Amino acid sequence: MSVVCRLLDGTDRYERTVTGSVDVRPEGLLRLGARLSDHRASVDVSLDVTPSPGFDVVRADGAWRPPEPAGQLEDLPDRLARLAGLRLFPGFRRRVVDVLGPDAPGAAQVADAVVEAARLSRQVTRLDPRHVPADPTPLDFRRLDLMAWPEFSDMCFTYSAASTSLFEEPGVRVPATLDMYVPRPGARLAFHRYKRAEIARADGVLTLYQSMFDQVHGFELWYDLDIQTQRILRARALTPRLPYMGICDQAQGRNQTLIGMTLDERWPTALRGVTGGRLGCFQFTDLTGDLFRLLSFE
C-alpha cells in the first residue's frame, strides 16, 4: 500500500486556487460564486440561494473558462441548472456528484467548485435588523451566529457551552462586520475568500499545503506524509486571523495529534475524531479534509 495524489499526472507538483464571493441580490437572495483553477482548467460556478434558515438553491449556473478542456461536461450549464431545488445541507456534495454524473470527465473539479460556493452560505445572512445591536460585543456576535446558523451549536469549541464564559474575558477580538449579518440588497462582495492548495512529491514524501484567507479567517496548514507507510510525519499550522481571536485559538494545535496517524480510506472518521467536535475547529477540519480528499490509497 502507498498514498498517491491522483492530480500529480506524472509531475511532482500540483496546485489549485479558489476564489469565492458573496453578493446580495436586489430581491434578497445570496449569490454565491466560486472559481476553481488548476493546470487543467478553470471553472466558474454560481448559486443563488435563500439565506438561512432556508438554504434553498433557486438557480445554479457555471462555465468553463478558456481554454476550455476538451470533452469535459460540455453541457455544464444545463447540468448545473438541475441543482435548483436542492438545499445546502449535509449530503449536498453527494447530490451534486449525482447530478453531474460521477464518472463524467471534469465532474470532480466542478463538484469541488460548487461545494466551495455552497460553504459561503455560512458566512453571510440576512437577519432582522431589530435583532442586531449597533455596537455588538463578541458575545453578541456569537449570539448572532447561532441565531443565523443554529447548526453551529456544538460544532466546534467556540460554539460549545464550554466557551461561553470566555467571551467576557478581555482581549477577545472579532473581525466580522455587521454587513455580513444585515447586508443591504444589491451589495457586492459582502464576503470574499481566497484559497490555495499545493501537493509536492520529493524523496518519498508528499507535502500537502492549504491556505484560506477571508474577512474572518487566516489559515495556513502543512502536512508531510510518508508515501510508502502512509503515515503523517509532520504537521504545522499558522492561524493569523480567526473569527474569535482569543477563543478560537484554544482549539488550534490539535493537528499535532495527527502526527503518526496512518491514512487510509477511513480517514474522514479519524480526522473528525481528532480535530472536530466540541473541542475542535470545523474550519480546520474542512481544510485538512479537502487536502486528504485529493489522495488515494493503492
Regions found by a protein language model. Name each.
Residues 167-206:
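Short, compositionally biased leader-like segments
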Residues 1-166, 212-298:
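Active-site- and interface-proximal helix/loop "cap" or "latch" segments in soluble metabolic
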